[in-house]
């Protein structure tokens, strides 16, 4: 979609056009190849920031660990991770002092969540490090594999139980002397193809059992796999992100639940709210500071940037915070919450795929896996890589690097926000005991600081004090990248504030366009995005109308569904023309069937099928909305579906759109080429799982099969349900006596087989 940006800004004040300077149009940069280098950078940097800490060795895994807590305070502006425990605890105490009962209440809320959360919570999320296969898998598969291994090792894991019970298993697994796992491996054979008589490589997948001793198992349980963060705009260098395994995930979830509950009660926290709610929260803080400073005081705002937030945070500090926050709570609760930070203090970073070497002269390519980096001769590497490897070598164990200090990206966003807010909270006059005071906003590593004082010297003193207070808890405000302005103009989490928030429309640009799900969903998502931007982002009526026309054009080109009376020739035009000619009411045809577009900015909230229903020929209605149409594999379609739209920064966000099920709501079938790869075993497991779930849903039509049915197993539940249904059908005359007898016989046989097993 080409839009000339100047058209959008003819009548826009200059400050509103700031968003056009953002790197948001066009494709974002993606990373290729291995993330090993980026991960080594992270590990080395993190250790450098804490280098004056104390070294110890983990007695269980033998991993060398660096502990910077209560280490020497930095003399200058260098970023450092030497947080002081007593300062953090005092900041927590002051935070509680200004918000009486906040920790107590959040603990009670969290306790309730802990007792109710089921283990299927862990199936949410995308790629997860699967410790049994030592690589990433979809979350649901990784959980299933973990539970399977736990079971075969005598733990009571149950995929429909409470998450807390699963976590007890995790704790027990760490005490076991060994764990037996099932791994997939590939065999390659050279064989002659009968047809072509050429030699080909055949791959077969085997499953084999493998025993892990306690040390190896602990290393895997504490491992975070690393990948390169994709699609980051406005950066020259890529960076590494981490994905933890199933052992850590559940514990992190509960800690974040507690921290989220605290953040919700803090007016300075930019999390967990978003969008307009966040803007309102921010506007309140600004209003408070402006109102108080009108006559006598100056008010300045810093658009803040912290240096390497994650790499200077420390899990040991989080442990201290949790210990304080939960101090009057029952022992079991305190234990559950303290495990996540303890695991993170002992974490291992997996270095990823390793390096690829190719020799131009001999046309050879070879992969050096991360496991070999500890022993390989360094003459093969260039100078910068050589330095990285030399530095990281003392930390390596089995292809993972011991990484005790620092938090990997995105793990404890909420809890680190609580820490940031606790420093903002210290800016009240009753704490500063002087003429300056501050307040601000914190959202993970992003902050805005508003300082009020009678004169410029006071402002400077306030900023200095804030800066030094942050240093005490391991937060490093970057003097180079933060800038100060009269209050009224600042930026926070890509919201631009200029006497009110300016709509940063360019951030939404990437979500305009055709999503590529299917014809039905794409139409619905496209118009919903335009509607939402009219509501939230100052998208004016003329621009919205233009966006709509561009969208329809884009949509028609994507699905080759130009109007039936067009001259454009595509693969589909023959069929669509035929349909156009035999349709009486042409306005009733959907755009994807070559019909005209009836959308305008007034009716974007109506699904296209509903908009055109009255205009459709009767037989077209019958074909379009026919659940028995053999060409469709229908999902159960809720009245509202969720699409993932990509804003220009931050995670992909979920957006609701109206879903009307038609024959255009198809689901593409899986690519077959997976069958020849090492994923095949997993695919078979997935299909098995899918079949069981489908079968279960046939018995319980309204069921979401993730919920357990009482205490009985799936099979028992299905058998008893089959019996009840059969009896009802027999008594109402829907089935004959013979059929009824046969069903009863099958049910009996199944139960017998179960007993024998």
Swiss-Prot record:
<keyword id="KW-1195">Viral transcription</keyword>
<keyword id="KW-1104">Inhibition of host RNA polymerase II by virus</keyword>
<dbReference type="InterPro" id="IPR001407">
    <property type="entry name" value="RNA_pol_PB1_influenza"/>
</dbReference>
<dbReference type="GO" id="GO:0039657">
    <property type="term" value="P:symbiont-mediated suppression of host gene expression"/>
</dbReference>
<comment type="similarity">
    <text>Belongs to the influenza viruses polymerase PB1 family.</text>
</comment>
<keyword id="KW-0808">Transferase</keyword>
<keyword id="KW-1191">Eukaryotic host transcription shutoff by virus</keyword>
<dbReference type="GO" id="GO:0003968">
    <property type="term" value="F:RNA-directed RNA polymerase activity"/>
</dbReference>
<dbReference type="GO" id="GO:0000166">
    <property type="term" value="F:nucleotide binding"/>
</dbReference>
<keyword id="KW-0696">RNA-directed RNA polymerase</keyword>
<feature type="domain" description="RdRp catalytic">
    <location>
        <begin position="286"/>
        <end position="483"/>
    </location>
</feature>
<keyword id="KW-1035">Host cytoplasm</keyword>
<dbReference type="GO" id="GO:0006351">
    <property type="term" value="P:DNA-templated transcription"/>
</dbReference>
<dbReference type="GO" id="GO:0039694">
    <property type="term" value="P:viral RNA genome replication"/>
</dbReference>
<dbReference type="GO" id="GO:0019083">
    <property type="term" value="P:viral transcription"/>
</dbReference>
<feature type="compositionally biased region" description="Polar residues">
    <location>
        <begin position="55"/>
        <end position="64"/>
    </location>
</feature>
<dbReference type="GO" id="GO:0003723">
    <property type="term" value="F:RNA binding"/>
</dbReference>
<keyword id="KW-0547">Nucleotide-binding</keyword>
<feature type="short sequence motif" description="Nuclear localization signal">
    <location>
        <begin position="187"/>
        <end position="195"/>
    </location>
</feature>
<comment type="subunit">
    <text>Influenza RNA polymerase is composed of three subunits: PB1, PB2 and PA. Interacts (via N-terminus) with PA (via C-terminus). Interacts (via C-terminus) with PB2 (via N-terminus); this interaction is essential for transcription initiation.</text>
</comment>
<keyword id="KW-0597">Phosphoprotein</keyword>
<comment type="function">
    <text>RNA-dependent RNA polymerase which is responsible for replication and transcription of virus RNA segments. The transcription of viral mRNAs occurs by a unique mechanism called cap-snatching. 5' methylated caps of cellular mRNAs are cleaved after 10-13 nucleotides by PA. In turn, these short capped RNAs are used as primers by PB1 for transcription of viral mRNAs. During virus replication, PB1 initiates RNA synthesis and copy vRNA into complementary RNA (cRNA) which in turn serves as a template for the production of more vRNAs.</text>
</comment>
<keyword id="KW-0693">Viral RNA replication</keyword>
<keyword id="KW-1190">Host gene expression shutoff by virus</keyword>
<keyword id="KW-0548">Nucleotidyltransferase</keyword>
<keyword id="KW-1048">Host nucleus</keyword>
<dbReference type="GO" id="GO:0042025">
    <property type="term" value="C:host cell nucleus"/>
</dbReference>
<keyword id="KW-0945">Host-virus interaction</keyword>
<dbReference type="GO" id="GO:0030430">
    <property type="term" value="C:host cell cytoplasm"/>
</dbReference>
<feature type="short sequence motif" description="Nuclear localization signal">
    <location>
        <begin position="203"/>
        <end position="216"/>
    </location>
</feature>
<feature type="region of interest" description="Disordered">
    <location>
        <begin position="53"/>
        <end position="82"/>
    </location>
</feature>
<dbReference type="GO" id="GO:0039523">
    <property type="term" value="P:symbiont-mediated suppression of host mRNA transcription via inhibition of RNA polymerase II activity"/>
</dbReference>
<dbReference type="Pfam" id="PF00602">
    <property type="entry name" value="Flu_PB1"/>
</dbReference>
<dbReference type="InterPro" id="IPR007099">
    <property type="entry name" value="RNA-dir_pol_NSvirus"/>
</dbReference>
<protein>
    <recommendedName>
        <fullName>RNA-directed RNA polymerase catalytic subunit</fullName>
        <ecNumber>2.7.7.48</ecNumber>
    </recommendedName>
</protein>
<feature type="region of interest" description="Promoter-binding site">
    <location>
        <begin position="249"/>
        <end position="256"/>
    </location>
</feature>
<keyword id="KW-1262">Eukaryotic host gene expression shutoff by virus</keyword>
């Amino acid at each position: 979609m080409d839009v000339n940006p100047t058209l959008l800004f003819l009548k826009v004040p200059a400050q509103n056009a700031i968003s056009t300077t953002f790197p948001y149009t066009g494709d974002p940069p993606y990373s290729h190849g291995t993330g090993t280098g980026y991960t080594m950078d992270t590990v080395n940097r993190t250790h450098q920031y804490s280098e004056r800490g104390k070294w110890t060795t983990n007695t269980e895994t033998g991993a060398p660990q660096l502990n910077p807590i209560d280490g020497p305070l930095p003399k200058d502006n260098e970023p450092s991770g030497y947080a002081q425990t007593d300062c953090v605890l005092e900041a927590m105490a002051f935070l509680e002092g200004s918000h009486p009962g906040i920790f107590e209440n959040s603990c009670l809320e969290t306790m309730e969540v802990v007792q109710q959360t089921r283990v299927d919570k862990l199936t949410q999320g995308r790629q997860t490090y699967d410790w049994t296969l030592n690589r990433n898998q979809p979350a649901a598969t990784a959980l299933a594999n973990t539970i399977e291994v736990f079971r075969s090792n005598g733990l009571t894991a149950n995929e429909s139980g409470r998450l807390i019970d699963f976590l007890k298993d995790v704790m027990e697994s760490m005490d076991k002397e060994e764990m037996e796992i099932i791994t997939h491996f590939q065999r390659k054979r050279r064989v002659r193809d009968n047809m072509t008589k050429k030699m080909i490589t055949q791959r077969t997948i085997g499953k084999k059992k493998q025993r892990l001793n306690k040390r190896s198992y602990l290393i895997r349980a504490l491992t975070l796999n690393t990948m390169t963060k994709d699609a980051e705009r406005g950066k020259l260098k890529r960076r590494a992100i981490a994905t933890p395994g199933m052992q850590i995930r559940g514990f992190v979830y509960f800690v974040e639940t507690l921290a989220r509950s605290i953040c919700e009660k803090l007016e300075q926290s930019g999390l967990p709210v978003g969008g307009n709610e966040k803007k309102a929260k921010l506007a309140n803080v600004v209003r408070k500071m402006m109102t108080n400073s009108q006559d006598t005081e100056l008010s300045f705002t810093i658009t803040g940037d912290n240096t390497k937030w994650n790499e200077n945070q420390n899990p040991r500090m989080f442990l201290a915070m949790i210990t304080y926050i939960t101090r009057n709570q029952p022992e079991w609760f305190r234990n559950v919450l303290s495990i996540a930070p303890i695991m993170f203090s002992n974490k291992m970073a997996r270095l990823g795929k390793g390096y690829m070497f190719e020799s131009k002269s001999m046309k050879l390519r070879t992969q050096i896996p991360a496991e070999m980096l500890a022993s390989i001769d360094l003459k093969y590497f260039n100078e910068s890589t050589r330095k990285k490897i030399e530095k990281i070598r003392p930390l390596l164990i089995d292809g993972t690097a011991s990484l005790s200090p620092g938090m990997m990206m995105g793990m404890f966003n909420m809890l680190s926000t609580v820490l940031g807010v606790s420093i903002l909270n210290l800016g009240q006059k009753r704490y500063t005991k002087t003429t300056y005071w501050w307040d601000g906003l914190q959202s993970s590593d992003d902050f805005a600081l508003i300082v009020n004082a009678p004169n410029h010297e006071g402002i400077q003193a306030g900023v200095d004090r804030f800066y030094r207070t942050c240093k005490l808890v391991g937060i490093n405000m970057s003097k180079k990248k933060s800038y100060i302005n009269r209050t009224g103009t600042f930026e926070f989490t890509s919201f631009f504030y200029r006497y009110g928030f300016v709509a940063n429309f360019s951030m939404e640009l990437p979500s305009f366009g055709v999503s590529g799900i299917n014809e039905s969903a794409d139409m619905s998502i496209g118009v919903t995005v335009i509607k939402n931007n009219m509501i939230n982002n100052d998208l004016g009526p003329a621009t919205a109308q233009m966006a709509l026309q561009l969208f329809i054009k884009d949509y028609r080109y994507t699905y080759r569904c130009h109007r039936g009376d067009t001259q454009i020739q595509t693969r589909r035009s023959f069929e669509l023309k035929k349909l156009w000619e035999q349709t009486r009411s042409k306005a009733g045809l959907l755009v994807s069937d070559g019909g005209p577009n009836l959308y305008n900015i007034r009716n974007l909230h109506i699904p296209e099928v509903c908009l055109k229903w009255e205009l459709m020929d009767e037989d077209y209605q019958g074909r379009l909305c026919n659940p028995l149409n053999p060409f469709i594999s229908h999902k159960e379609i809720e009245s509202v579906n969720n699409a993932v739209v990509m804003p220009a920064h931050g995670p992909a966000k979920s957006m609701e759109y109206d879903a009307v099920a038609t024959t255009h709501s198809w689901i593409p079938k899986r690519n077959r080429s997976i069958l020849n790869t090492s994923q095949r075993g997993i695919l078979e497991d997935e299909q098995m799982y899918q079949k069981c779930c489908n079968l279960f849903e046939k018995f319980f039509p309204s069921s979401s099969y993730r919920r357990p049915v009482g205490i009985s197993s799936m099979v028992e539940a299905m058998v008893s349900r089959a019996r009840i249904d059969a009896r009802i059908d027999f008594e109402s005359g829907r089935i004959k006596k013979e059929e009824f007898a046969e069903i009863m016989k099958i049910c009996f046989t199944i139960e017998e087989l179960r007993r024998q097993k």
